[in-house]
């Protein structure tokens, strides 16, 4: 794109507005070199970068790259085998540190999905070894002692010599203080000296290095420290030589990585530039426009970026609209509207956010041409018209259907009739060439051209006749009208004169009345649109507020629910643990039988009713939401029917789950238990487990049921297992159990029947249905 348009529209001043948001010299250089692009993919990629940066700022408000120098010159010197100085190495050190920080930031970044920026983050290369080497130079420009063993040794000797000199001079100060002009150790020519009174200069042997301007003080290096000072001078030279060697070594370490370091520096600068674009967008209430795939554009509430408190206007260039002619008197803001359109296009095609509202859309033009100058002076000359025409000729010879043309005061500077005809002919040529054009003019003849010609539309700038001031509001579709009579009347011109003037221009007055009606309709429409926008904004704010309140309420509800559940569960667990502990102690001390333990526990329950969490609808719903994930082997559960805790041990092929509930194994469907989150309980001593079988597919009652299989057992063994099984079932509040004894000789079956008949906690028992085992299985109801 031609660079002339950048000067005409003051694009560099727009770029200067971004400077305050940039931290790195690399970003400043990128901004300086920024020019409009014509590749839609490149432009869209830069818009995507800004959008993704805004998402990063949602999660990390303080995201920043930090202040970094441009290291392109030091890297160039490295490629020429030159050694870098301390400041250049510090600059590279900071770039490497910033690269590592940015890489870590990306690794820790969450809740943000990146596409364009992802490619940049992943191209950053870390150099931990180089960073470690460069730590030998601190940010103050001092080479640390640990940079090399030799440097450390030299500085150790320097300190020893310096301490010896200081001690020697301190001794002289104490002994000969009366001979000194001041009681201090001075320095001259890099050597430690004493300020001796001139009258005593011969009393202290040594070398005179300086005399005060008054001649009263002589600065003498005592003979006792001359040798030490000589050694310090030599050590200083050795130190400089060693530091130069260290700088050379560090430069050699960096040399093979110049390309990668340069790439890191560019990425850091580019990230900083993207950050600056986002901050500009945020501060100026700018937006990222859409890109049209044809040459249509729509700018909503677009503002001129260089004006303070600019008036926002809507502007559109539909596909079937080629030329917009802004007519009307001067000083109304026509030129500003031209520049606003031009700058919006330049900014968008440079990958910058524009000052407009969401929904705005820009086109991509290969070239933008403008002829904009100050034509409002009454002292116009032929040279002005010649210059104007020269520019127009250049534009017409170069522009094509992929261009945007902006012309201010087309045809001005010559005879009005000829100028109007010339302007009309130029606009017609641009229209037939399908070149998007916006032109301003004060020629009334062009109003009719805009009305009568296809693909051409009139526009004007609103003028407030009440205040006699322009409002700078752009009215597309409404031609400009003269306000001379109204202004003259309001300024006090005799009404007779005004009427006479109006009678002389009856035709124009009719046209002006029509235009006035159009203006009124346009203003009314704009007011309605603004009202609709205000309502939309209020609705948006209200929706956000409601959503925020809902989220806060949901969060507090979940917290309180979880807190209540935890407190209740802790109370229940504590009560049960205490009761179990009491019963265990009783059992251990008095050797109570299991059924007596059951009786005792029943009495405890009657004395202090337990909270039945399984019937609490709110908690059940909360648990159901919390346990939305699929159950897994090892999960802690609560059996819904009994409120008992257990652990899932395996899953059967039919989808049911095997669970260990105390000493009993149970077969459960997925809807017969809920998952719970508990701390791992201390392991209890292993106890003999009861062998059980899977539950039959059909039973006489619903819900989970425990089973005992006694088939193949001897009488004594079977009775022991039956007694332990019934006790455990009662302890776990189970209402029904199944005992599989088979038919065989009938010995075990009869023994089971006798046991159940005499057990006080067995309400009733019966054989299972024929389909579930018949007389080979007994179902007992407990209570």
Swiss-Prot record:
Biological processes, Gene Ontology terms: mismatch repair; negative regulation of DNA recombination; rescue of stalled ribosome
Function: Endonuclease that is involved in the suppression of homologous recombination and thus may have a key role in the control of bacterial genetic diversity.
Keyword terms of this UniProt record: ATP-binding, DNA-binding, Endonuclease, Hydrolase, Nuclease, Nucleotide-binding, RNA-binding, rRNA-binding
Family annotation (InterPro entries): DNA_mismatch_repair_MutS_C, DNA_mismatch_repair_MutS_core, DNA_mismatch_repair_MutS_sf, MSSS, MutS, MutS2, P-loop_NTPase, Smr_dom
Protein name: Endonuclease MutS2
Residues that coordinate or bind ATP: 328-335
Assembly notes: Homodimer. Binds to stalled ribosomes, contacting rRNA.
Domain Smr residues, every copy: 708-783
One annotated GO molecular function: rRNA binding
PANTHER family named among the record's database cross-references: OS10G0509000 PROTEIN, OS10G0509000 PROTEIN-RELATED
EC number: 3.1.-.-, 3.6.4.-
Family indicated by similarity: Belongs to the DNA mismatch repair MutS family. MutS2 subfamily.
């Amino acid at each position: 794109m031609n660079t002339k348009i950048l000067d005409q529209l003051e694009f560099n001043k727009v770029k200067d507005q971004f400077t305050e948001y940039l931290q790195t010299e690399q970003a400043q250089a990128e901004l300086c070199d920024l020019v409009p692009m014509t590749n839609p993919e490149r432009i869209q990629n830069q818009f995507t970068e800004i959008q993704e940066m805004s998402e990063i700022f949602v999660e990390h408000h303080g995201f920043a790259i930090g202040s970094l120098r441009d290291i392109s010159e030091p890297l160039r010197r490295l490629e020429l085998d030159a050694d870098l100085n301390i400041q250049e190495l510090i600059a590279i050190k900071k770039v490497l540190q910033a690269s590592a920080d940015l890489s870590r930031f990306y690794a820790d970044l969450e809740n943000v999905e990146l596409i364009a920026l992802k490619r940049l983050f992943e191209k950053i290369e870390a150099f931990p070894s180089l960073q470690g080497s460069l730590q030998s130079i601190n940010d103050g420009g001092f080479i640390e002692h640990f940079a090399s063993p030799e440097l450390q040794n030299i500085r150790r000797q320097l300190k020893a010599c310096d301490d010896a000199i200081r001690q020697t001079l301190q001794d002289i100060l104490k002994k000969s203080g009366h001979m000194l002009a001041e009681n201090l150790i001075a320095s001259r020519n890099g050597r430690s000296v004493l300020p001796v009174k001139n009258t005593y200069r011969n009393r202290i042997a040594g070398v005179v290095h300086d005399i005060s301007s008054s001649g009263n003080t002589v600065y003498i290096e005592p003979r006792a420290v001359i040798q030490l000072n000589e050694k310090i001078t030599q050590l200083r030279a050795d130190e400089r030589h060693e530091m130069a060697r260290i700088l050379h070594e560090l430069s050699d370490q960096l040399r093979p990585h110049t390309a990668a370091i340069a790439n890191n520096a560019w990425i850091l600068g580019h990230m900083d530039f993207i950050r600056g674009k986002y901050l500009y967008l945020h501060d100026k209430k700018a937006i990222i426009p859409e890109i049209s795939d044809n040459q249509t554009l729509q700018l909503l509430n677009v503002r001129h970026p260089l004006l303070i408190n600019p008036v926002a206007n809507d502007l559109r260039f539909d596909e079937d609209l080629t030329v917009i002619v802004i007519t009307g008197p001067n000083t109304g803001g026509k030129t500003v509207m031209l520049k606003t359109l031009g700058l919006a296009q330049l900014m968008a095609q440079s990958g910058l956010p524009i000052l407009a509202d969401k929904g705005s859309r820009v086109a991509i033009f290969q070239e933008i041409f403008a002829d904009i100058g100050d034509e409002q002076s009454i002292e116009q000359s032929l040279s002005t018209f010649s210059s104007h025409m020269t520019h127009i000729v250049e534009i017409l010879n170069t522009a094509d259907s992929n261009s945007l043309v902006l012309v201010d005061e087309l045809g001005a500077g010559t005879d009005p009739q000829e100028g109007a005809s010339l302007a009309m002919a130029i606009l017609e040529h641009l229209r037939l060439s399908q070149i998007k054009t916006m032109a301003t003019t004060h020629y009334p003849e062009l109003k009719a051209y805009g009305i009568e010609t296809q693909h051409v539309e009139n526009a004007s700038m609103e003028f407030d006749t009440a205040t006699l001031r322009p409002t700078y509001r752009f009215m597309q579709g409404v031609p400009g009208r003269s306000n001379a009579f109204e202004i003259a009347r309001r300024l006090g011109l005799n009404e007779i004169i005004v009427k006479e003037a109006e009678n002389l221009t009856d035709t124009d007055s009719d046209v002006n009345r029509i235009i006035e009606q159009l203006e009124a309709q346009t203003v009314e429409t704009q007011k309605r649109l603004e009202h609709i926008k205000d309502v939309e904004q209020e609705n948006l704010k209200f929706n956000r507020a409601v959503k925020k309140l809902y989220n806060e309420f949901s969060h507090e509800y979940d917290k309180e629910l979880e807190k209540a559940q935890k407190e209740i569960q802790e109370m229940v667990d504590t009560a049960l643990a205490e009761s179990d502990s009491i019963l265990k102690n009783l059992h251990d001390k008095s050797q109570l039988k299991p059924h007596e333990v059951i009786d005792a526990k029943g009495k405890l329950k009657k004395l202090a009713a337990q909270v039945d969490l399984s019937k609490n609808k709110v908690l059940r719903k909360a648990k159901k939401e919390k346990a939305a994930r699929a159950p897994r082997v090892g999960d802690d559960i609560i059996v819904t029917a009994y409120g008992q805790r257990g652990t899932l041990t395996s899953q059967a092929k039919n989808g049911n789950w095997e669970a260990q509930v105390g000493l009993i194994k149970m077969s459960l469907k997925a809807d017969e238990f809920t998952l719970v989150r508990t701390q791992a309980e201390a392991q209890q001593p292993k106890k003999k487990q009861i062998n059980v079988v899977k539950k039959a597919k059909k039973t006489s009652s619903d819900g989970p049921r425990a089973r005992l299989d006694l088939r193949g057992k001897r009488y004594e063994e079977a009775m022991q297992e039956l007694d332990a099984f019934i006790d455990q079932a009662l302890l776990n509040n189970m209402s029904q159990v199944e005992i599989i004894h088979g038919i065989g000789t009938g010995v075990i079956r009869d023994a089971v029947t006798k046991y159940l008949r005499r057990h006080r906690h067995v309400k009733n028992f019966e054989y299972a249905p024929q389909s579930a085992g018949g007389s080979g299985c007994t179902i007992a109801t407990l209570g």
